Amino acid sequence: STTPYDAKEIPSVAETLMNIIPTNPFNALSTQNLLQIIFFALLLGFALIKLGDKGAPVLDFFRAWTEAWKEITNIVLEFTPFGVFGLMADIVGKYGMEVMLPYIKTIGACYLTCFLFTIFVQGGLMAGVYGGISPVKFFKTMKEAILFVFATCSSVATIPLNLKCTKNLGVSDKIADFVIPFGAVMNMNGTAIYEAVAVVFASQVFGIHLTVAQQVMVMVTAVLASIGTAGIPGSGLVMLTIVLNAVNLPLETIALLAGIDRILNMARVIPNIVGDAAVAVVVAKSEGELHPELVKAEE
């Protein structure tokens, strides 16, 4: 038998936006309110930039702190498979085998949405309409980068290959060298799509109805959470906690999705890197730095 989830009241859009601003940054850290933490981190970062050399010691401290936590995270990840097995066994035991159907729906929805977004928005609208490059030519040129990122699930690791493909589209070196590395950190279209799909998955598994207005709020939060997500495998799953907390959905969703995250990751990274190239094409076109005659993709 299944155990129903006792849903909390879902906050309004206005409440969610207001809750992003922390009244006490240390309380946000202790309660793991990630949206408030990100907001405060942005303010602190801007302040340190304005301080210039005076802020250098603090920046050095945070860089060392970041590297230390990366090492700790790597150690923890070694034990992740055992933890995921235990968590999934617990969730399935509580809620029954019915949770398997939403898995199939989630994988299908994630792949279909990412595919349509990549083909029609990035390839058709951005590269085709705004960039003036044939979508067929665009995707032929991007083929290597797409296959590589599909296998590695890392947009950061794909930067060199994405740079090569983008320059083969006729984008100038100075535009490509700026847009592609920047986009690998800031432009996470696929991650935003995945997080929205994951929330719908959670609502189905735990029997929580989300209104259209609440789904729009989830989409806004997903976009905010995806900005700056690390371009490495599994980072989208970590940032999903922000979106789940925003609508008071159970964090057990992370355990349920962890087992299929690699499959979902393979889909969501493609819009990330294709979007970077499409943006580079649009920017290059607007700046007169796009040279279609240099495109090396075969017709």
Label for each model-derived stretch:
Residues 71-78, 168-184, 212-214, 251-255, ...:
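Membrane-interface alpha-helices at helix entry/exit sites of multi-pass transporters
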Residues 1-137, 299:
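Signature of multi-pass transmembrane helix bundles
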Residues 1, 109-144, 148-149, 155-158, ...:
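Transmembrane alpha-helices that form the ion-translocation and gating core
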Residues 139-195, 220-237, 260-282:
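Alpha-helical membrane segments and immediately flanking helix-loop junctions
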Residues 196-299:
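Transmembrane alpha-helical segments and their short flanking loops
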Residues 77-91, 151-157, 252-256:
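Hydrophobic alpha-helical transmembrane segments in multi-pass integral membrane proteins
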Residues 51-56, 64-67, 95, 131-134, ...:
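Juxtamembrane helix-boundary/capping and inter-helix hinge elements in multi-pass membrane proteins
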Residues 42-46, 83-90, 123, 127, ...:
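Transmembrane alpha-helix boundary and packing residues in multipass membrane permease domains
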